[in-house]
Structure formats: C-alpha cells, structure tokens
C-alpha cells in the first residue's frame, strides 16, 4: 500500500517532545507577551494538537503580524518554485517562542547609540561601521634548530627482491 500523505505524515521524531520535557506545559508559555513586529521561532509542541502549524513551518522564523486571545499570526517566508512568498499563518502560543535572531543587532544598536552620545558630548564624529577582521599579526618561532631533510633514492630492483 502507498504511504499516506496526511498533515502529520513523517513527524514521529519531528514533533516528539524533548528528553525530560514531557508532561505538563509550564505556565510561562501562556504568560509571555507577544507584540506585532516581534520575531518568533515556530517550534511545534507535539503535546498540543490545537493551533498546530503544518510540519513545513516547524523551525522557521517569522514576524508577528496579528495577535489574538490564544494565538498569534506569523508571517513566514516560503519558497514556491522560483519565488519566495510571505505566508501568513495563525499559530497558538504554545507553538511559538521568542526568536534570538535580532538579539545581536539590538545590542549593537544600543552600544552604537551610547558611542554616538559620548562622541556628541565631546564634539567629534565617529564611524559605527563594523570593520572586517584583519590578518593575524606575524610572529617569530624561537628555540628551534633547522634540520635539512634529503630524500632517500628509491631503488626499484631491491624493492622487488624484498630488501632495502
């Protein structure tokens, strides 16, 4: 018989709960606040069947475009053929978590604002552009003696006899 093509086909391991994370859902899952524009990771919780997204969206990062009482609307990119479409899906809060994709950007932005404020107080202009890492500085290897290595000539006749 042919394999089924159901909504949850081939998700035995994909939707399995992690080791020592089975059982009740912590209350903090429901007490988190989501705002429009936040980045979230779609991470399906196999224990809750309501509001579960399709397996394609598991592990995807999207942006919240709608917030309802029990669910959030997430806008996720999906490649279809040769184009990328922004798909809008509604997912229950149990299946999403705050993404850390913009964490580094927010820290850099905060640091740059502090640097700009300090530079403005001193009356100077600074560049907040990131510079690529340059080559490593050179160093001298000390305490080593040079040893000249010469190749040993290969003797075909002796090698066939089994000797050196």
UniProtKB/Swiss-Prot annotation:
PANTHER family: 60S RIBOSOMAL PROTEIN L21 (PTHR20981). Keywords: Ribonucleoprotein, Ribosomal protein. One of its GO terms (molecular function) is structural constituent of ribosome. One of its GO terms (biological process) is translation. It comes from the Eukaryota. Gene3D superfamilies: 6.10.250.3260, Ribosomal protein L21 (2.30.30.70). This is Large ribosomal subunit protein eL21z/eL21y. Belongs to the eukaryotic ribosomal protein eL21 family.
